[in-house]
């Protein structure tokens, strides 16, 4: 019995040290350390130092707790941009930052020290808060580095840094002396749970159950339209504010009805009469008279709670007939419209709510109650006086403190404000120059700025940058630049703690001491801190505006907003040229993540289990302009996509071990020329997608190309790669294409999967090889020639027809695979007849005839290359090609 000869050693089998198993969790740590040891980030900056800049400015995450999946999405997107721009040759330094002041850290310290803010010295609290914030920053820094960021995080910025704080005070000073910052009494968002004012960006809306009460105020001084003892019908969802009532607003041109029921006359807007009567359950009523709102002006009534005082009817521009009664109860310190109208009409301003939400002595018998707890007691009080027309509870969207998640109120207090109205035209003009993605980004920002009148920047807390204001002996604000400059110098030297550590005289220049001045105790809003980064952050060789701000969609009312206000105020221009936003990260079912639901996906767990490159590929695959989903199954799907890319890279590397690109001097022919043109088109499309920040399209274009490549070109190439002579023309043309494809693939994936790209690059016998793939240059776009694609369409149409027929024969078990087939083709095409169709279609035998036909090929299988040949062509059991190859 003859032994079968083993021809394996005569074949050109793939060889590479690039492993099939990625081992990302192990390799990522190794490569990260190598990059840090070799100072790769600094080498990239040095290489591009004199080139055009592209700077992504990092919006500072809050230094509290581990990073979550939203942080990972954000930082990876930024890193992809920075890496891509660096490969393009841009000088693209990335300086990460942290937001380090604010209530969450302050509350954390109070909780750990088991005290409230009144039981601890401010200086001690601040020292502990700083220590905590710095520790949290270090934790997050390590977690960010594990995302395989390009930056080495050596150069960072912190809002608690004394240099940053000093620059923030310089901004405050400029805005103050430009008349943009002022102190005033005004109702603002007030959080009883935080005992501080809030800015709009710190307010979130959740469903909340509130009381709805219809009551009436008895007229004590009428006119020709209404009489004493007639009743003004009022609707409110904040009964606790009735304590502070001092007026009722009507619409000047709204028609009102005097309607009689239950032996009394009631005043209500005519358009709301039927609805109100239906709510009250009143079926029989009589309209006694109708008149305009202007006819009610000056009418006096008995106040609902402080019954010994009277209120007055005034004109209200905000009164509508959408709901309620058309008469609006006014408590001037508990609503913006109430405040403005109250000032115009000199209405009493009553503040009966303490900082913590409890009622003070102004609340008479309700003193000591929490404001919301007083609602039911006030209802009972009104019922005793027969003043409750209707009462119920209803659920509606209501503002909450974004940190404590507790309801907030409008409350008039002395606060420091930025006047947006004064600077609004300049901001809107700058917004017109900004490019935004998605396309609605700029309009959204402009709308939010247009709708802002003021920005409350003072906070009644301890952990933050102080408002550097002194008051003289008459309690007047001191307007002296020299005083400001002296404080700024002290902060630059000692940090903002100096404001709390030193006495007033110690903070003042010598000529201002001993004047019995006092200092402001409020601190600045953290959004003023983070909004100051275009002033406070210095990057070598970089000036405002930065090229890109990239943050979550919530930052249109947050960082995007505060940054452009502060930058226009200080620099006179926008801090960014391009605005990019991403959505929120939801679970696999599209639900918001929460610990209660148990659907939180931890980026650290993904990295530990699969590797950062997998997490980064998931990010690149997301259509991030919208909300995105992540789950175990989505990550596993990403792993599969990753494997396909990795396997193709491994195949390319394995078959280039004997190829020297510098020695290639052949002209591409046939299918090889077509593949080269296809690569040009793919590179063009990928470059366009990268430049459009469409990373999903980058991955889609690359994977589609590699998939098509594997299913056709690489499949038909295996025969030549493995079985041809090493230096055969066919083999070298294939390797030329494979080299170019691999070279392009590695720079394409480098911004997205930096570890995998570097791992493959280490194993790539590349011409003019750099120390790292990340020091390579991104290819430039060239337009492909579509003439070849049109020419070759005829072949691919034929291929589809042939394979359709072959599949039928395989299903009928007449043949096992394509090279078992003898295919007869009906064609008169010179192009098709000029091709090596047997090779291109991987068919056993090709004939030309009158119709397309597939038959079994009565053949001999070459034991070396496994191709099927005519029995008459066998030479010592081999096909002629294999015989010549091993005997040459």
From Swiss-Prot:
Q: Name one GO molecular function term.
A: isoleucine-tRNA ligase activity
Cofactor names from the entry are: Zn(2+)
For the motif 'KMSKS' region, give the residue ranges: 592-596
Q: What InterPro entries would the database entry show?
A: aa-tRNA-synth_I_CS, aa-tRNA-synth_Ia, Anticodon_Ile_BEm, Ile-tRNA-ligase, Ile-tRNA-ligase_type1, Ile-tRNA_ligase, M/V/L/I-tRNA-synth_anticd-bd, Rossmann-like_a/b/a_fold
Residues bound to L-isoleucyl-5'-AMP are: 551
Cofactor: how and how many bound: Binds 1 zinc ion per subunit.
Where it sits in the cell: the answer is:
Cytoplasm
Q: How does it assemble?
A: Monomer.
Q: Which family does it belong to?
A: Belongs to the class-I aminoacyl-tRNA synthetase family. IleS type 1 subfamily.
The protein depicted here goes by the name Isoleucine--tRNA ligase
